[in-house]
């Protein structure tokens, strides 16, 4: 039962997230020979105020 977690910054549309879940499921199913119904995709959308790189929040760039 594969679990795939994807973290990304806010701003993607619902259609983009829907397509991402579908396409990731396809790739994992193909490569691991796992049934699609057993693949879990977890999307973790982060606010730009809650993520930083090099000491600077993304919201401050």
Curated annotation (Swiss-Prot):
It is an enzyme of class 5 (isomerase). Transmembrane segments: none annotated. One of its GO terms (molecular function) is isomerase activity. The active site is at 2 (proton acceptor). Gene3D superfamilies: Macrophage Migration Inhibitory Factor (3.30.429.10). InterPro entries: 4-OT (IPR018191), 4-OT-like_dom (IPR004370), Tautomerase/MIF_sf (IPR014347). Its EC number is 5.3.2.-. It comes from the Bacteria. Keywords: Isomerase. The keyword GTP-binding does not apply. The keyword Isomerase applies. It holds the Pfam family Tautomerase. Belongs to the 4-oxalocrotonate tautomerase family. This is Probable tautomerase lmo2564.
């Amino acid at each position: 039962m594969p679990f795939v977690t994807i973290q990304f910054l806010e701003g993607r549309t619902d259609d983009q997230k829907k397509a991402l879940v579908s396409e990731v499921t396809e790739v994992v199913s193909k490569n691991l020979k796992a049934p699609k119904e057993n693949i879990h995709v977890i999307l973790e959308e982060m606010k730009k105020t809650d993520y930083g790189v090099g000491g600077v929040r993304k919201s401050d760039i």
